[in-house]
């Protein structure tokens, strides 16, 4: 846990001092939201500052700075939800938004008095808050230029380098009709590099990057040169890549970035809204085996400085580590307030939204498989012929049945227990529950991906983290190679 000013208090002071949104104003808006007889109301105030600079082939291509602000107002009446938002924090605009959301409970016309109690956050999982947004543009450009020089110096075949840096500072305040007021100040940054290697007519590109819930201190851990050299290494590696073997073969998933396969192919099916609707492969299966007994999966929003971490969710609930699968047994789902009420469960701190313009839904934060008893060498050494997957560009999954397709960005052939030739971009085709049941070895080298993933669901994007130890899936379909 990082020692820093209480972000909840900081957020409350920010909205009170800048916009006059104090406890009295909040209580009045909540009363307006419940004026038509709603059971519960919630205000979600947001002020977000974004910045981005990109360098393309040694030229500054863009430099952007934007501010977005507003409030989303939700009213719950039975199983119905009314939602409205306004980009204006003017008192009259907010009152009209509250009245619009209130119409879901129209007909009761019950006056409601709200007693609000601000609360502080007991823990913060972010960095020291030395925000990139506080750095001059010239300092950010210097970081990009360092990456450009390092990638080009790595090998003469590097013909082009693109780099970008993005930062965000989001101040949120959640006020609820049960009296709770809680806020947060959420930093986020990301640094990306693309390198292009050219040998004759053979052109190969690779992209890498990282970031998290921190600021300039990220570069004390991973320098621009580190990121650039990794992108260059991957691009050069693809120059000598060969076709992947086709058909069903053993697949070793490397520690770290391979966790995106776990996130997409399995994690979404464990979000409670899909199970409430009966559209998930895991509906009504709590307490049942859903994976190999080597598999334990958690979703943990409390990992310090990770991209998916948050102090409180967007409903104001404290976040925590949630065990989803334990020893192959399904233990629970990820809940927001609505799904928790439906299942008679406690909220898991998983209610998230892209912004004040969007409704709440259960979402993952940092989704991880815990380490097992084997070593990475033992896992790889057990494979006579298969593939070793290090990183992915993303994929597609059918939530209802778990079928997925993923494309690798770095993968290798395994022959007689040894990693040999690099492979061209390769598609993995499979089924999430089936892949979990085929996990035959799990190593002790768990690693978290370095903060580059964003998850999309029903039109909403949120930052997430993924992690995995080295894992052997005894059989998975390799569905072809895309020539670079």
Q: What is each PLM-predicted segment?
A:
Residues 1-484:
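N-terminal small-residue-enriched
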